[in-house]
Amino acid sequence: MESFSLRQNYFPRSSHDTAEVFPAPDSLSERERFHQLQQELVHQYERIFPDMTAEKTIVIIPSLTIDQELLTRVSGSVHYEERMLSLLMLLRMPRTHVVYVTSVPIEPVIVDYYLHLLPGITGNHARQRLTMLSCFDGSTKSLSEKILERPRLMERIRSSIPMHEMAHITAFNTTKFERTLSVRLNLPLFGCDPDLLFHGSKSGSRRIFKDCGINLPKGFEDLRDENDIIDALVALKTEDRNLQKAVVKVIKTLAYHKSLLEPLH
């Protein structure tokens, strides 16, 4: 695989240039390109992140990329994107730029509130280094998908990054859509490779603990449906007749729906 330098190939051609060819989403070529970009993140993490005076840009994509049907159950889910406004505190570094992208525009008074919390930096100075962009789309589709559907918006994100500055994407969570966005914007992603996400899941973590011989609560992983759950609970009760309760963990859901305490009578 040929070597790749983000600094040498920083700005790709316009999104509207039909001669520009991107790897197919979720393809091997896209994965290879993504891994090349991630090597640049190593350099940024070691050299640029600790330097408070370095010129850098953080592109914040607060995309809640989870099942759309699940999001429809949450009133005002689009406002979850405001939770990463705390990252505007990065503007306390005087040569740092932030590009913040949302589904719908955030009220200026909310942004001003955060900017006035900055220590030692005036709100006006920080605002000059902040670019707020929006898809103007309040649907339950994830923000990352919305951006990918809008080549002009991606071009605006690119043009908001000062020439020759180091930059990376920070996202709420990482999936194949954030990986594709990373490749399309030619920016490394400050997050886990989506192909490795399973190892940090509840089932994946239990597997790792077992493989390493680490003690962990008795239980089962990789359960797929209601019958699997019933079989697992029966097996636990059969093994320990004194067992009174078991916790059923749900992998892909919102924070307040992750666990169910099941009595075993």
Q: Each predicted region: which residue ranges?
A:
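ATP-binding N-terminal substructure of ATP-dependent carboxylate-amine bond-forming enzymes
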Residues: E2-R207
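Active-site nucleotide/adenylate-binding loops and adjacent lid/helix of ATP-dependent enzymes
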Residues: D193-H265
